[in-house]
Regions:
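Exposed, interaction-prone regions of secreted/extracellular proteins
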Residues: 2, 12, 32-283
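Secretory targeting and sorting signals
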Residues: 2-34
Length: 283
């Protein structure tokens, strides 16, 4: 029998400017945080936000699938479970998206690290993503979310395949700081101000590739080059370690009926801090 299933909420706010509490960061040698994006970038960001407004990300459990790993119709990666998680981080190179066109159906993939959401209804997370279709050109972006305190906040829309990304979530008491850094392309990095959540369970930590869902079900998963997660670190209570230092759940993404694999993580490396997530099919 498959084990616990993640529960994840991802919704958007229509906003033409960064949300309150967000500190945009210039990378070394780039424009300062006060830089205003060009009109074309602002328009693109609004177009992305319009698509994001109808996303929902509650996991859909698969019935009758027998696995040693966890089965999901929208998540692929690793989730640690336990209690008192206070930080996690990872690095990756932004995957390249293909079979994705402006005039085609809406497709999306997001890659993130986060606390909670696997066995709770709160989510504190940040990462990168790509969206296309329904009249919007293929666009890569950075984002963060606190749910239910905040919904998804799209930040930079200038991410490119091959960009070097690092992401972290750090909790101090009931305050969370989410940071995503694009060390390759300016205008995508950010650090949030401390975000409050007194009801967050801090019961899981995740490194996940995901396809969002709408009211009609999960979106098609665009083909992505292998997402390689490295330098994954996590802390819970006084214990610090890697993914394998805690109870780790390997999450494989299946289509809606559980008939075939859409994305699948590799085994962890010997250090327990790296894995590869491989695209298999769109739907």
């Amino acid at each position: 029998m498959h084990r616990r299933h993640p529960s994840f909420r991802l919704r958007a706010l229509l906003a033409g400017v960064p949300a309150a509490g967000l500190i945009l960061m210039g990378t070394v040698g780039t424009a300062s945080a006060a830089h205003t994006p060009a009109n074309s970038q602002a328009a693109l960001r609004l177009a992305v936000q319009r698509l994001l407004t109808h996303w929902t990300h509650t996991n859909h459990a698969i019935k009758g699938v027998t696995l040693k790993q966890v089965g999901s119709t929208n998540w692929s990666g690793y989730a640690d479970t336990g209690s008192g998680f206070s930080s996690l981080s990872a690095k990756w190179t932004e995957p390249k998206i293909s079979n994705c066109s402006t005039s085609g159906p809406e497709k999306a993939a997001v890659f993130w690290v986060g606390i909670d959401g696997f066995s709770s209804t709160t989510v504190e997370q940040g990462g990168t993503g790509a969206i296309c279709g329904a009249g919007t050109p293929l666009t890569y972006f950075t984002w963060w979310e606190m749910f239910p305190t905040n919904n998804i906040q799209a930040v930079g829309v200038k991410v490119k395949p091959g960009d070097k990304i690092s992401a972290s979530v750090v909790r101090t008491g009931t305050k969370y700081v989410i940071k995503v850094t694009d060390s390759t392309t300016a205008g995508n990095s950010f650090t949030t101000s401390p975000q409050s959540c007194s009801t967050c369970k801090n019961s899981s930590a995740e490194w996940i590739g995901e396809r969002p869902s709408t009211s009609s079900g999960p979106l098609p998963l665009p083909k992505f080059s292998t997402w390689t997660v490295t330098a994954a670190a996590v802390k819970a209570g006084s214990k610090s370690g890697t993914i394998k230092s805690f109870t780790d759940n390997e999450v494989t993404m299946f289509n809606k009926k559980g008939g075939h694999v859409l994305a699948q993580p590799s085994a962890l490396n010997s250090a327990g801090n790296s894995f590869k997530d491989v695209w298999k099919a769109s739907s």
